[in-house]
Amino acid sequence: MPPGPEVPVQVWVDGQLFQAEQSLLVEHCGFFRGLFRSGMREARAAEVRLGALSASGFRTALRVLRGERPALAAEDELLQAVECAAFLQAPALARFLEHSVTSDNCSLLCDAAAAFGLRDVLHSAALFIRDGSHELVAQLELPEARAYVAALRPSTYVAVSTHTPTPGFLEDASRTMCFLDEEEDAWRTLAALPLEASTLLAGVATLGNKLYIVGGVCGASKEVVELGFCYDPEGGTWCEFPSPHQPRYDMALAGFEGRLYAIGGEFQRTPMSSVECYDPATGCWSFVADLPQPATGVPCAQARGRLFVCLWRPADITAVVEYVVQMDKWLPVAELCRSQSYGHFMVAHRDSLYVVRNGPSDDFLHCAIDCLNLVTGQWTSLPGQFVNSKGALFTSVVRGDTVYTVNRVSTLVYAIEDGTWRLLREKAGFPRPGSLQTFLLRLPPGTTGPVATALPEL
């Protein structure tokens, strides 16, 4: 009989002995599931010899399966981890590698994943390369990896301004989404919003290269729009889907691990702490763990496959919390005491969260940016101040190693490097007034549209 789930299994790899729980190996590795179900002698003896793998690669695999997040910087470490993920058929290790892609390792991971048949890792690395510099493509060695990258589409910066439903016969230019045509330095119209859709105080997020809009309001009474709307750029089509069980507006909406999360928000002028999760496969919403406190308009960001929310507490405390799906809990991450006059925003890059906040009330047009290193838990402040005219920094979207921001005057692209944001280039401003929600979409080849018409200030 195979050993019980709590009996340790001895695994010899490259002359080194490892001990691991059978239940852990069976849960996470297709190789060990097949082995222990086979009744082979190694399984009965609770001793396995793996001659094809490296000891350091297997050690990394065990650490990841046990919930650790090892830093893999050396090329050998990355290659051995890819080899282990493929040989052991370990999805958790593959996901860890997907979330570890950076400009430093994307070409290596892309080649290795193509060689070992790890399609999800290949796809994540290739998407990163497609959005990066030409030098990243040049670093690829395998023709199949180069071909895979070439077949992908780059992501495009898209924006939608504040809009509330108007009678269908009225031509309302604000009822459109626009994308930045960087080659022509112009904002072009991508699609019109559905007549019933509102982006005023709505949650907007992307998931699986589709755009979702939830919880906009109409009128002075803030009547919540009853349906959600989903845009698919592949066909340029909209479809409707149910709203959360709890009507809400001014929420955070996040696409994370194949699901949408409607986080906090307000209803009938009452802030809420409840959170709901939407599964597009079933079309159903379900409640998950509440936030630690009621919150509206909370910034959220994803780093290394983790979902973070930034709360603002009395006495100028910024609190970062993380939602852990497996535990269905919000766990505290870090706090920082900083003064701000109104609003804050958050984006992620590699192991860092960047919290953008307005300065004190006498200088609210300037922003300070604080950086939380998720590995060390340390806060640092980016040198200097950043102008936040018309809320430009609150439209920040990270694409590779760059940050896109936009207001009516200009679109500014920053490079994230050497502990700061360095202005890289300037493009055309968004020609519409009002607050903006921004995101990235991969548009079909040849997508074009009329240049967005300028509208007067409200």
From Swiss-Prot:
It comes from the Eukaryota. Transmembrane segments: none annotated. This is Kelch repeat and BTB domain-containing protein 13. Expressed in skeletal muscle, heart and lung. One of its GO terms (biological process) is regulation of the force of skeletal muscle contraction. Substrate-specific adapter of a BCR (BTB-CUL3-RBX1) E3 ubiquitin ligase complex. GO terms for cellular component: cytoplasm.
